[in-house]
Amino acid sequence: METCETTNGKSDIELYKLFLKGDNDAFNYLIIKHRKMLTNFIMTYVKNIEIAEDIAQDSFMYMIINKVEYDFKYSFKTYLYTIAKSRALNYLKRKKRTIYVEDAILNNVNLEGNIENEFIIKENYNALIKTIKKLKNEYQIVIYLYYFQGFKYKEICKILNQSMPKTKMAIHRAKKLLKKFVKEDNNYDEGWWSIC
């Protein structure tokens, strides 16, 4: 379970249950904790930070207004991302846009250390993004959820509303294609491309 020190060790699910009983502070903490990563996830769909922020806010508002008890065998984060995905797809249906991953990944980069290391890390991320963009949109999304968000297969299945075999196959194929693209470019530091 996900725990957090500032709320006396309560998990996200416990905080959400407190919110369902009327504790708005518990939900405010969940918003603060998940807003940035949720916005980054939505960016994989809409490629516009302002729109992603609006959809994230809309997702939280949906939860506030509806106060639904979801299936607590899944994490709160899975439930939240499922709502956000639905809202992002609704937006795309209206706008008929393409799904992108680049900005969401760059927003997750934590550059620490000296300037030379920062430059090398940024160069590697730019190379990774360029390689990921060669993948089909379906593969871009599973790579982002699995490697950059840390979701488990079961959670990805729930978020994308697809079967476990399809999810595993998509991740496997995406990794295989990434490895192929990296070898074709052969100018990357092999140690850095550990996800392949």
Task: Name each model feature, range by range.
Residues 3-4, 20-29, 39-58, 164, ...:
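Short, charged helix-capping/linker segments at alpha-helix termini
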Residues 1-37, 133, 191-196:
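N-terminal module of bacterial RNA polymerase sigma factors
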Residues 20-21, 47, 58-75, 95-96:
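Sigma70-family region 2
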Residues 40, 54-61, 74-86:
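Structural recognition of an alpha-helix C-terminal capping motif at a helix-to-coil junction
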Residues 8-9, 98-125, 152:
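Internal acidic/polar
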Residues 68-71, 82-102, 121, 173:
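Arg/Lys-rich amphipathic alpha helix in sigma70-family domain 2
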Residues 89, 148, 154, 158-185:
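DNA-recognition helix of helix-turn-helix
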Residues 142-146:
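A short pre-motif secondary-structure segment
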